[in-house]
Every structure is written in structure tokens, then in C-alpha cells.
């Protein structure tokens, strides 16, 4: 973008090969992450004097899928308010007209690391339990608002040095109503629930499976089910958890059931072998924080049949994590909108662009985007 076309209150910052057109309130940009969905920079908010993370969405209107994802991410970040879910601090675009609208910047709290980095650390039971508790609290809040995350993975969960945890990236999130009998979605394969792999309808428990995979990875230090492709992913799961019972297979579509039934049969590996005592830290001061308790919870989360998989509420009540629950403070409460309704259905890229632009204009009217005590 030429300097003459940079709007007032903005300036251009080259980050690698990307031109960031940023509000002047944000300085000291440095790249901290990049991927298919965009690039993320750390910066200093000169208005609040606090560190922030700024995400520039990558080509949000390249196609319908990108446009829908951008719309969902902005809407959910703006509406969901919970201490274990990353919050929206600000949002802006240098483009002033819908016809020119191509860039969206999202400003968030800056965290210290994601769980990919934490997995390499030696964590004691207190930290393992507390991280798991916070993941479940964040998911409970989303579910209470009728939202299934669908894309939980270590890179989408961020932490601070004091062990506080937040869930981010809602571009794939769907309402529970939308998810009923949905076709499989594109998401990181390793954390994909069996019912999704097999093309079944899915519900909130897809997130429980993903949390179980992440928890197991924190303990073992490596991915539990590193499938090379769709079929190999299923094989990796049954190699460890065993071939599911006939009652589960009977619920599959005929062609899928025939395929699964003709695969090699596996007996489940005992969880005492999968998660042996020597993989865990030494015992904690709290008698409930033991390898046996952690294994028991894992065995209830990593269940192929979603109807038999533990719910989020029951997982939060489990001895290994409920040590952190304070009923008097409502520490896992879900205050906020009772149900979030997302625009769905078939829309063109231009329609998604117009809807997101309208939401952003409304955000400008209700927030001090520039940090000068005025609305845009």
C-alpha cells in the first residue's frame, strides 16, 4: 500500500514479506507466529502501555471458506467473555469502504507460549491438573453458549508463565444445532474425534476427545495418534484403544461399517501401559493428584463411542481436576450470552464480506478503537 493511501491514524510496518497497516496506537511490532490463517505480531499498546498480540487474517476473502471463517472468528471473539477464552481487545481495518475491504486485524491479550512449547516441559501434577481444569472451563463456557470449538489442538491453547490458560481460534467453531449430522470438517487430524473420522453426526463431546488427546500428549510428551492420513488416523486410534463394540459399529453408514468391520481387529492397550507411572511426575501434596487419578480421567475421555465418553461437566467433577473448583466464587461459571446465534447458510464471498464489514462498523461505533476517547 503506498504511503499516500494510508489512512489517518495508521502507518505501515513491513513484517517479512507482509505489509501490516497498523493503528498508530500500536508500536514495537515483532513477528511471533505465522500460518495458513494469518500472521501474529507482538506489539505495545501505547494507550494502555500493555503488551498485545495483533493477528492479521490471511486473505480473508480469498474464497467462501476463508470468508466464513473470518466472520465466525470475529463474531465469537467479540461475544464470548470468559477468563479461559482469549478475548478481543480491539479490531480494525484500514479500508473504509466495503468494496475495498480486504484486511482484518484482531488485537488480543499477549500470552507467553502455546501448549506446543509446554509439552516439552516437565510439569508437576498441580500444573497438569490446573491446565486441564482451565481447558475444561473454557470449553464448558463455549458449550453453554451453544458453541462447539471443533479445532482444539496445542497450538490453539495459550498460556502465561503463571500457568493461566486461554483457548483461541474460533474460525471453525459451530453451533450445536449446526453440528448435528454435519459432514466431516477440515481440522488438525491428530485431535480429530472418531465420530468425525467415520462421518457420523457429532456433538459437544468432539471437544472432550480433543482435550483428552492434548492431556495425553502433555503426559507422554508426544502426539497420541499421529495418523499419516484419514485411514491411518483411525488405525492409530484402534491400535491403542481397541476395535469398538458391535453396538457402535451398527450406528455407522453401511459402507463405512463394512470397511471398519473388515479391518484388522485390535484389543485395547491397558491405560496402565499407555500412561505408565514413570511418565508422570512424582506424587503431589494433594492425595487426589496422582497418576492413577489422571489415568482414570484419561480413560473416560479417550472413548471411541461418544455416547460413552465423559461429558465436560462430569470431567470437571472428576477428582483429578475438581480440586481447583471454588463453588463460592463460581470459578468455572459461564456468565455471558446464553446462546450465540451465528449467521450460516450459503453465502457468496461478497455477502460474507458485507456482513463482516457491517459487524466491524458496529464495533467501531461502540468501542474506542483509536484509544483517544472517541468512536470511529
Swiss-Prot record:
Gene3D superfamilies linked: Phosphorylase Kinase, domain 1 (3.30.200.20), Transferase(Phosphotransferase) domain 1 (1.10.510.10)
GO CC annotation terms, alphabetical: cytoplasm
Residues the entry annotates as binding ATP: 33-38, 55
Transmembrane segments: none
Reactions mediated catalytically: L-seryl-[protein] + ATP = O-phospho-L-seryl-[protein] + ADP + H(+); L-threonyl-[protein] + ATP = O-phospho-L-threonyl-[protein] + ADP + H(+)
Keyword Lyase on entry: no
InterPro entries associated with the record: Kinase-like_dom_sf, MAP_kinase, MAP_kinase_CS, MAPK_JNK, Prot_kinase_dom, Ser/Thr_kinase_AS
Motif annotated as TXY, chain positions: 183-185
List of residues that carry Phosphothreonine: 183
Domain annotation Protein kinase: ranges: 26-321
E.C. code: 2.7.11.24
Catalytic machinery residues: 151
Domain notes: The TXY motif contains the threonine and tyrosine residues whose phosphorylation activates the MAP kinases.
Protein's UniProt name: Stress-activated protein kinase JNK-1
Higher taxonomy: Eukaryota, Metazoa, Ecdysozoa, Nematoda, Chromadorea
Protein encoded by which gene: JNK-1
Amino acid at each position: 500500500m503506498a504511503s499516500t493511501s494510508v489512512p489517518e491514524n495508521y502507518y505501515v510496518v513491513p513484517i517479512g514479506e507482509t505489509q501490516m497497516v497498523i493503528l498508530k496506537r500500536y508500536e514495537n511490532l515483532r513477528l511471533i507466529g505465522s500460518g495458513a490463517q494469518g500472521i501474529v505480531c507482538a506489539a505495545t499498546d501505547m494507550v494502555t502501555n500493555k503488551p498485545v498480540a495483533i493477528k492479521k487474517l490471511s486473505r480473508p476473502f480469498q474464497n467462501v471458506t476463508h470468508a466464513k471463517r473470518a466472520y465466525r472468528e470475529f463474531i465469537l471473539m467479540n461475544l464470548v467473555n470468559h477468563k479461559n477464552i482469549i478475548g478481543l481487545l480491539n479490531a480494525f481495518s484500514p479500508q473504509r469502504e466495503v468494496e475495498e475491504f480486504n484486511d482484518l486485524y484482531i488485537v488480543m491479550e499477549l500470552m507467553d507460549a502455546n501448549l506446543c512449547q509446554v509439552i516439552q516441559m516437565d510439569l508437576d501434577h498441580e500444573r497438569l491438573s490446573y491446565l486441564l481444569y482451565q481447558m475444561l472451563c473454557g470449553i464448558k463456557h463455549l458449550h453453554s453458549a451453544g458453541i462447539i470449538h471443533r479445532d482444539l489442538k496445542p497450538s490453539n491453547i495459550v498460556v502465561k508463565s503463571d500457568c493461566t490458560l486461554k483457548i483461541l481460534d474460533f474460525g471453525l467453531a459451530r453451533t450445536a444445532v449446526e453440528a448435528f449430522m454435519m459432514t466431516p470438517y477440515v481440522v488438525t487430524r491428530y485431535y480429530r474425534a472418531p465420530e468425525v473420522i467415520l462421518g457420523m453426526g457429532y456433538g459437544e463431546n468432539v471437544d472432550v476427545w480433543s482435550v483428552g488427546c492434548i492431556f495425553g500428549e502433555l503426559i507422554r510428551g508426544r502426539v497420541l495418534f499421529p495418523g499419516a492420513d484419514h485411514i491411518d488416523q483411525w488405525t492409530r486410534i484402534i491400535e491403542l484403544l481397541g476395535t469398538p463394540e458391535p453396538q457402535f459399529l451398527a450406528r455407522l453408514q453401511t459402507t463405512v461399517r463394512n470397511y471398519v468391520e473388515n479391518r484388522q481387529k485390535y484389543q485395547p492397550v491397558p491405560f496402565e501401559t499407555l500412561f505408565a507411572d514413570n511418565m508422570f511426575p512424582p506424587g503431589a501434596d494433594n492425595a487426589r493428584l496422582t497418576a492413577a487419578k489422571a489415568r482414570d480421567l484419561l480413560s473416560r475421555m479417550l472413548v471411541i463411542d461418544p455416547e460413552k465418553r465423559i461429558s465436560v461437566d462430569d470431567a470437571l467433577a472428576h477428582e483429578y481436576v475438581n480440586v481447583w473448583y471454588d463453588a463460592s466464587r463460581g470459578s468455572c461459571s459461564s456468565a455471558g450470552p446464553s446462546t450465540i446465534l451465528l449467521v450460516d447458510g450459503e453465502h457468496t464471498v461478497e455477502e460474507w464480506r458485507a456482513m463482516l464489514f457491517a459487524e466491524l462498523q458496529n464495533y467501531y461505533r461502540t468501542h474506542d478503537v483509536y484509544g483517544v476517547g472517541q468512536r470511529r
